[in-house]
């Protein structure tokens, strides 16, 4: 009897699915995307405005397609079990065409977690391929190819060869460039404060001492203004003989609510803040947790639900499991009477998806720690705690706000000081988890000082008045967390695009990281300026969000993809032709990037220039000084030991039988990691560690020994 064939994307997912399905099925992996638009040409029919794409099977997937085609002929039924989103639907469609699988044999199965229950339910309820989802993904791919292929030549002619533009990446770059312009234009404003220490009477050491700050002039609306030291000294002099008493005491109970379960963007943000994982690293590790890991007696099982989602929905079974766990672990007081639900705030969130959660609450992080590597454990621990905390009761605080009057001043003016204090009376979800905040964000003050018992009309002693000078601060640069948050809030891209977009900006040298924050390079600023001037629609945040909305409509069957592209392309085509004719070339000195390196010949700074053989370091004193040297080229891969960029280096002497070129950490000598073979951006499909190139077409993983063809780039959602 022929076995049914199940096709998934990766070997790890295939192993986990195979274990649950048993011997009547054979699960094989496509190793990701198998077809794409051709390299080196547009691959889209423009003459008749049908935008019909031409797809080629990727070179490194031809052998895999042949194997899948053979296996499909031997199978009675072929189940396409790729990921449960538009990209997964498109992969299934491409597999059907590339492997020439008869449609009558094919069934589509969808699951959001790789567990026995979820897989059994999916295979009991197969469906046909969803043409609307396929069309939405195809429209995205075609649109991004149109934008990338038409804009990039404009940059080559007006800025520098080898540059790229894209519908999502260019708008993300604009956010970084605009923020830098805000910072540069910011003018700090001086302001002053007066902090004070008060004591109950009679004084008894530090007992009954608390802090307050001047707030207002009685009878005058708004906060008191102290723009400079002169005004502040006037107030201090006025307060010399003042007497103080409690005007009012206001007490209330305050609630602190838990954060919603993770969606893709919030997981990337929190993993950066708490774990210092890049968005890309977070998604690699989350993929491992989703596809399945061996956890002892359970065998291989998916530990979390699908990690590309913008929905905060949680399945009823998981909610019930969380409530039961909370009651048994923390007590009934910590579990609400009914499940907590969180409203969707992301534009176009796909409600069929779930939030990112553990597939079993009972699989506590510490119980499976020995089966996970450090990165896997830390991310799983974060996801598990976030979900459980989201189903716990609020933390409760007794908050007190005290108004203190200052009378008897020399000018007759009466001032108001304010003090606040807060005491946690019930930990609630904080017994397990507390969300971090972005760098540069205003911290949420809990007013944590413990105020003494105070009564209205009670006299107080002022122990000291401390003036303080302050200056307003510019908006902070974006971190990975805050940039992902901005992309999400403004509807730029989708969960699958956040990580590759950030990686593209770095790899193209459009931005650099300065103490963990994104700063645009001169090149990035020049590219943004040119594109914003000549392609205002493409660079408009609202336009990008509108496109995402239209893609959502296509996915929902409310719109056809060809008319959407026709509406976009004609004005875009005119803008490209006009820019090629009218745009001025960007002067070289506006894109030459300054460096910290000093010229060995004359002592002037070295700058990064571009020549016919690529980028290099040149003395800024050229042509008086002609000193130049090779530039360390980033290879687009993070150092596995410290997370810095890996760069290409040259050894001073070549060892016999070895090339002088090797690849080392840019953080040398602090980090000494190095390899002789070129690191590849795609992780090992077996263990997700680093792959290196072996010759022109093969790859190898030093960690697990995997060998296979070099994977082709699969960042299909972001135009390059």
What is each PLM-predicted segment?
Residues 1-141, 150, 215-216, 223-233, ...:
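Intrinsically disordered, low-complexity regulatory segments
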Residues 2, 83-84, 160-164, 251-260, ...:
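Conserved short loop/turn motifs at secondary-structure junctions
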Residues 2-5, 16, 23, 98, ...:
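Basic, low-complexity terminal or inter-domain segments flanking catalytic cores
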Residues 114-196:
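C-terminal or mid-to-C-terminal helical accessory/interaction module adjacent to the motor/catalytic core
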Residues 139-151, 168, 198-200, 254-266, ...:
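Core structural elements
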Residues 158-162, 177-228, 274:
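C-terminal helical "lid" subdomain and adjoining coupling/linker elements of P-loop NTPases
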Residues 220-260, 458:
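Metal- or metallocofactor-binding catalytic centers and their adjacent structured scaffolds
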Residues 246-249, 257-271, 298-306, 474-486:
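Short acidic, hydrophobic short linear motifs in intrinsically disordered regions
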């Amino acid at each position: 009897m022929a076995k049914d064939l199940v096709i998934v994307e990766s070997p790890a997912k295939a192993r986990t699915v195979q274990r649950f399905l048993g011997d009547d099925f054979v699960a094989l992996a496509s190793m990701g995307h198998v077809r794409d638009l051709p390299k080196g040409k547009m691959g889209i029919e423009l003459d008749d405005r049908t935008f019909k794409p031409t797809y080629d099977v990727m070179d490194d997937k031809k052998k895999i397609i042949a194997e899948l085609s053979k296996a499909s002929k031997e199978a009675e039924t072929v189940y396409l079990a790729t990921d449960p989103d538009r990209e997964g639907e498109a992969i299934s469609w491409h597999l059907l065409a590339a492997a020439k699988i008869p449609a009558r044999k094919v069934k589509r199965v969808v699951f959001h977690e790789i567990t026995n229950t979820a897989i059994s339910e999916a295979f009991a309820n197969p469906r046909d391929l969803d043409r609307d989802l396929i069309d939405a993904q195809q429209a995205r791919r075609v649109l991004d190819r149109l934008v990338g292929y038409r804009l990039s030549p404009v940059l080559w002619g007006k800025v520098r060869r080898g540059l790229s533009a894209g519908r999502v990446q260019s708008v993300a770059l604009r956010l970084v460039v605009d923020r830098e312009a805000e910072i540069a234009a910011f003018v700090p404003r001086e302001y002053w404060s007066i902090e004070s220490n008060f004591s109950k009477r009679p004084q008894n050491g530090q007992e009954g001492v608390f802090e307050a700050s001047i707030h207002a002039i009685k009878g005058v609306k708004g906060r008191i203004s102290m723009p400079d030291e002169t005004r502040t000294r006037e107030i201090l002099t006025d307060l010399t003989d003042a007497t103080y008493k409690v005007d009012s005491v206001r007490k209330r109970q305050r609630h602190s609510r838990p954060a919603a379960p993770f969606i893709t963007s919030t997981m990337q943000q929190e993993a950066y803040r708490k774990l210092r994982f890049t968005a890309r690293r977070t998604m690699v590790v989350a993929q491992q947790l989703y596809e399945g890991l061996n956890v002892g007696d359970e065998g291989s099982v998916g530990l979390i639900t699908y990690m590309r989602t913008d929905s905060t929905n949680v399945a009823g079974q998981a909610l019930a499991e969380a409530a039961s766990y909370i009651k048994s672990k923390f007590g009934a007081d910590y579990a609400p009477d009914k499940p907590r639900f969180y409203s969707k705030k992301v534009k176009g969130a796909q409600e069929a998806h779930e939030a990112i959660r553990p597939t079993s609450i009972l699989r506590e992080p510490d119980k499976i720690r020995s089966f996970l590597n450090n990165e896997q454990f830390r991310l799983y621990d974060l996801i598990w705690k976030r979900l459980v905390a989201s189903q716990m009761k609020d933390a409760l605080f007794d908050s007190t706000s005290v108004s203190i009057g200052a009378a008897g001043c020399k000018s007759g003016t009466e001032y108001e000081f304010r003090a606040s204090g807060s005491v946690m009376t019930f930990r609630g979800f904080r017994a397990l988890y507390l969300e971090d905040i972005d760098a540069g964000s205003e911290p949420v003050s809990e007013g944590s000082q413990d105020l003494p018992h105070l009564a209205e009309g009670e006299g107080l002693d002022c122990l000291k008045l401390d003036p303080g000078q302050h200056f307003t601060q510019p908006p902070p640069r974006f971190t990975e967390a805050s940039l992902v948050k901005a992309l999400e809030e403004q509807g730029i891209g989708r969960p699958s695009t956040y990580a590759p977009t950030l990686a593209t900006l770095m790899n193209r040298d459009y931005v650099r990281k300065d103490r963990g924050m994104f700063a645009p390079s001169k090149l990035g600023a020049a590219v943004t300026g040119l594109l914003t001037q000549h392609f205002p629609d493409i660079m408009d945040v609202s336009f990008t969000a509108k496109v995402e909305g239209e893609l959502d409509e296509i996915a929902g069957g409310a719109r056809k993809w060809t008319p959407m592209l026709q509406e976009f392309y004609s004005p875009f085509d005119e803008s490209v032709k006009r820019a090629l004719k009218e745009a001025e070339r960007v002067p070289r000195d506006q894109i030459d990037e300054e460096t910290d390196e000093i010229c060995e010949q004359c002592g002037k700074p070295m700058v990064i220039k571009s020549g016919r053989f690529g980028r290099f370091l040149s003395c800024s004193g050229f042509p008086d000084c002609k000193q130049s040297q090779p530039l360390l080229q980033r290879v687009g891969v993070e150092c596995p030991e410290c997370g810095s960029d890996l760069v290409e280096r040259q050894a001073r002497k070549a060892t016999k039988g070895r090339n002088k070129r090797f690849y080392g950490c840019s953080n040398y000598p602090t980090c000494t990691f190095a390899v002789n073979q070129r690191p590849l951006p795609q992780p090992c499909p077996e263990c997700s560690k680093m792959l290196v190139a072996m010759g022109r077409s093969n790859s190898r993983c030093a960690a697990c020994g995997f060998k296979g063809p070099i994977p082709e780039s699969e960042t299909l959602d972001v135009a390059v």
